[in-house]
Amino acid sequence: MNTKHVTCRYFLHGVCREGGRCLFSHDLATSKPSTVCRFYQRGQCAYGARCRYDHVKPCNGSVFYPPQEMAPAPLESTPPLLPTQEAAAPVTKSAPQRREKKSVVLRDRDLCGASVEKAHPDPALRPGCAADPPVSELEAKPHSYLEAICTGLDETPIPSAYPDAPQQLCPFAQAGGCHYGESCPYIHGNVCEICGLQVLHPYDQEQRGHHEKLCMANFERDMERAFAFQASEGKVCSICMERVYDKQSPSERRFGILSNCHHTYCLACIRQWRCARQFENPVIKSCPECRVISEFVIPSAYWVEDQSKKFELIEAFKQGMGKKACKYFDQGRGTCPFGGKCLYLHAYPDGTRAEPEKPRKQLGSEGTVRFLNSVRLWDFIEEREQRNLPDAEDEVAELGELFMHLSGVGEEPPAASN
């Protein structure tokens, strides 16, 4: 079925979203319904510029839509009466007196007098239209609820969605390139000598100083990392005799730095050494080469040899470990064997930190002093309960054999001599 000869009703209302792909006709010459707003010609359109119909003023000879409640008299048949004629005219009782209706004040005064101005030059004698009120009165009294709501909105400037757009730096130029070029509404900043990006505001000196300071700090940090990587590249582990950065797994490319020693070890080898149980505690805590005891091992991605930087690394390591809860203390439910020397957090469930216990001292017979951990009575009871006691039956059997041996039972008598 061909629908091109049928006028699209959505196009008549101005809301057809198909455009050129529409199957119906968009030719207004063949459309019968009028798209002219009748309420606008009456001066009563409340939609204003948002109306979907055409707001066209009627020309001379065009059809004028009067208000529905008004019934204007014909202009040619009944001439208007002058004030003197109205006074002399006889009043007849037979003629029904029609109640005079209130005239409608049009919003557009030119619209009211466009078709009647030539016939009735006097504004007071225009039919269907009252005398024009003063302009100030029209402006003071709104004609509809919509107009009353919108009063003053047209004069108020609409704030821009980007009030500081001319003062902002272009984010595309900061990232490396803006394809808008000179037509970009944002400012293209000056090029920073350190990072090489357009991030310096040409007018804001505070922003320029802040960025230069931040950029210089990042540059110094990157240079320190580059020097640290260069110093760590050729380090060889003293246990496995392999270069640390040449290991296959990236997780193994870390150094195990001893707190009191400067020998090089990879983290996996030195941890394996300190976890051995076949040696005494002072042996496994000491360096495999110089035998200097170190309390802990610090994992690091770079080798640190300077003593000041090593102290900074140790403090950062302690602060990081101090934020993790100790699994032996277990929020007060357990006992940590390391006591106050533990690097992990000893805190109760409410967040209160536990005070480190003072170590107990014991003086030996030879004058030596030993530090003891917390001693509890239950430890002695548990040790006694777990002690292997001799079986009573074994003791009875052993005593019986001893008694029989002493009494001479079971021994063969000596042979009689001939």
UniProtKB/Swiss-Prot annotation:
Region Makorin-type Cys-His: start-end pairs: 192-221
Stretches the record annotates as Disordered: 76-100
BP-aspect Gene Ontology terms: axis specification; cell differentiation; DNA-templated transcription; embryo development ending in birth or egg hatching; negative regulation of inflammatory response to antigenic stimulus; negative regulation of neurogenesis; negative regulation of non-canonical NF-kappaB signal transduction; nervous system development
Enzyme class: transferase
Keywords in alphabetical order: Cytoplasm, Developmental protein, Differentiation, Metal-binding, Neurogenesis, Nucleus, Repeat, Transcription, Transcription regulation, Transferase, Ubl conjugation pathway, Zinc, Zinc-finger
EC number: 2.3.2.27
Catalysis performed (reactions): S-ubiquitinyl-[E2 ubiquitin-conjugating enzyme]-L-cysteine + [acceptor protein]-L-lysine = [E2 ubiquitin-conjugating enzyme]-L-cysteine + N(6)-ubiquitinyl-[acceptor protein]-L-lysine
UniProt pathway: Protein modification; protein ubiquitination
Ranges annotated as RING-type zinc finger: 237-291
ZnF segments: C3H1-type: 2-29, 31-58, 164-191, 320-349
A GO term, aspect molecular function: zinc ion binding
Keyword Repeat among record annotations: yes
PROSITE patterns in the cross-refs: ZF_C3H1, ZF_RING_1, ZF_RING_2
Subcellular location: Cytoplasm; Nucleus
Stored InterPro entries: MKRN-like (IPR045072), Znf-CCCH_4 (IPR041367), Znf_C3HC4_RING-type (IPR018957), Znf_CCCH (IPR000571), Znf_CCCH_sf (IPR036855), Znf_RING (IPR001841), Znf_RING/FYVE/PHD (IPR013083), Znf_RING_CS (IPR017907)
GO CC term (a single one): nucleus
Reported function: E3 ubiquitin ligase catalyzing the covalent attachment of ubiquitin moieties onto substrate proteins. Inhibits neurogenesis and axis formation during embryonic development by modulating the phosphatidylinositol 3-kinase (PI3K) pathway. Acts downstream of PI3K and akt1 to up-regulate gsk3b mRNA expression.
Name of protein: E3 ubiquitin-protein ligase makorin-2
